[in-house]
Amino acid sequence: MDIEDEENMSSSSIDVKENRNLDNMPPKDSSTPGPGEGIPLSNGGGGSTSRKRPLEEGSNGHSKYRLKKRRKTPGPVLPKNALMQLNEIKPGLQYMLLSQTGPVHAPLFVMSVEVNGQVFEGSGPTKKKAKLHAAEKALRSFVQFPNASEAHLAMGRTLSVNTDFTSDQADFPDTLFNGFETPDKSEPPFYVGSNGDDSFSSSGDVSLSASPVPASLTQPPLPIPPPFPPPSGKNPVMILNELRPGLKYDFLSESGESHAKSFVMSVVVDGQFFEGSGRNKKLAKARAAQSALATVFNLHLDQTPSRQPVLSEGLQLHLPQVLADAVSRLVLGKFSDLTDNFSSPHARRKVLSGVVMTTGTDVKDAKVISVSTGTKCINGEYMSDRGLALNDCHAEIISRRSLLRFLYAQLELYLNNKEDQKKSIFQKSERGGFRLKDTVQFHLYISTSPCGDARIFSPHEPVLEGMAPDSHQLTEPADRHPNRKARGQLRTKIESGEGTIPVRSNASIQTWDGVLQGERLLTMSCSDKIARWNVVGIQGALLSIFVEPIYFSSIILGSLYHGDHLSRAMYQRISNIEDLPPLYTLNKPLLSGISNAEARQPGKAPNFSVNWTVGDTAIEVINATTGKDELGRPSRLCKHALYCRWMRVHGKVPPHLLRTKITKPTTYHESKLAAKEYQAAKARLFTAFIKAGLGAWVEKPTEQDQFSFTP
């Protein structure tokens, strides 16, 4: 018998004892001998002096009569370990023994399991424990964080019933389970009382164990009680101090103008570094503590479903919240470097955006590709018919244009020589042209929700989602109709201003002379443009002649995150789209907020926009009203500049590597029309908006694109 079998026998016998339902056992009679008091009962053999077993009531006088065992009333469902949870989520997984090392009395086993194309390894003194550790790692790849019962204990066991993504069970079954560890056996189980009030008792119907039971296996649920606040008004700093006494908080930086200061505090917990920012040091300290509680102890103080990440349908290589916080931190850090720790006059901004690239599962290897700011669009009188002015200087639009420069640079790197091909993010596609390497992903960060449909909601009504202000009684949800007719509408930005308005039915075509005579130049909202990228890709029409469609893997918001509204704006409202060309799809990226939401940026928005792409030595500052820099020079991101890059790459790519065969084009407009699959996908997108009753896409005057290449 090997070590594993011995342990299995031992653990199974212990499990039987622990699982015995003591509540169903009759109370001990005073006449019944206690342990060590009675004489051993006879086994039926002769010579025993033990007394006979008394006849039981209802035995019909037969000594060997046995009562039928009563069916035990099912007690509370015991918490499931990681192995059990993973088996329910992904049944039929095969665990492989990779190695066995160490002496006989202290062996070390390494087991592996493949889940979603990834291999996870676990080690332990027995095969069983090694399998358990492998299962935990696998679960962590798509479930947010492991459970920590000590955090719940510090909260006085007042757990919120919303400790997992229950609102998304139908759409995301993989996120049903948050816990990997069973609670401490010394802790009695606590349950919400069946009367639905806030009291706790040791019996009831709704289990608050770390591993929720799938709805299909339980009785009809009772009314959900309201979320519980931290006991005795404990704030994150107090709760963290109970879990890890004596922590030291460090003041890292102070930035911003006098009326809009931003402080950054940090704390180290269990070797992990956490930052928090806020308008004062106290708030920054609390946010640092809150971030630590969420990451280390799986203790989330804001558990409303709308604040939870909306998982992607594609390959998820990273833990959602870890990725979101890392992307935010990287973009803010790069912007700080570029603006001398926010001291530069051009550090002023309302919205900050950036694109981060990951090339594997470790977010430590992530790289900032672009950073930008801005909230305004060009004034109609400054339109350029040579592609020399930027029409839209909103931060997220500028970040994506900066990303295009990086993609051109990577294509040129691949085309240089064979040595550089390994350094490029592109590789040849078996379908013709180029495609991204498998592990390369791009993540879009925006410091607030994009203007347009994603921002049309009231972030503070009511105070708690599903609760009336100043009340502990459940009311109607905060937004009963997140998809009502007013939602999802295409919207346009206001020229030389902020905010958006719904498109008019007759405004789909704009004319050059009409705009010059005083008609407002209309630009589609950022929500609408990002929804467009989720269909046609972020590479645009020109690059699609060389590369397969590229999509964002995640969209991270620094503030004003609401999962329902953001997912509707990004892709749900066009879920009726059909007949897309090959390789084009309706992309559904990860959507997430960050642990420490950015403070609102009060005051008037600056009239400039800054941009930076990896490889640049400094930021470029553009006047958003004119679409050019202060000296009247065109931006490195303008249509003409990017068209020059495209022509240069087009001259280097062998004809057989083009995804679309194209003769030498004469104008920018003709070059874009040559990308026939891209244009077909765009047409399907516009049709989907119209069929859904959301309005017609408004395009710029065609004269803007009728320019030729001039080196």
From Swiss-Prot:
Brain and peripheral tissues. One of its GO terms (cellular component) is nucleolus. Residues 1-79, 176-220 are annotated as: Disordered. It catalyses: adenosine in double-stranded RNA + H2O + H(+) = inosine in double-stranded RNA + NH4(+). It comes from the Eukaryota. The modification Phosphoserine is found at S149. 1D-myo-inositol hexakisphosphate binds at R400, R401, K529, R532, K639, K672, K682, K700. Zn(2+) binds at H394, C451, C526. The keyword RNA-binding applies. Its EC number is 3.5.4.37. One of its GO terms (molecular function) is double-stranded RNA binding. GO terms for biological process: adenosine to inosine editing; base conversion or substitution editing; facial nerve morphogenesis; hypoglossal nerve morphogenesis; innervation; motor behavior; motor neuron apoptotic process; mRNA modification. Residues 78-144, 231-298 form the DRBM domain. Its cofactor is 1D-myo-inositol hexakisphosphate. Changing M84A: Strongly reduced RNA editing activity. Changing K128A: Reduced RNA editing activity. Changing M238A: Strongly reduced RNA editing activity. Residues 370-707 form the A to I editase domain. Residues 192-213 have a biased composition (Low complexity). It is found in: Nucleus; Nucleus, Nucleolus. SMART domains: ADEAMc (SM00552), DSRM (SM00358). Catalyzes the hydrolytic deamination of adenosine to inosine in double-stranded RNA (dsRNA) referred to as A-to-I RNA editing. Homodimer. Homodimerization is essential for its catalytic activity. Can form heterodimers with isoform 5 of ADAR/ADAR1. This is Double-stranded RNA-specific editase 1. It comes from Rattus norvegicus (Rat).
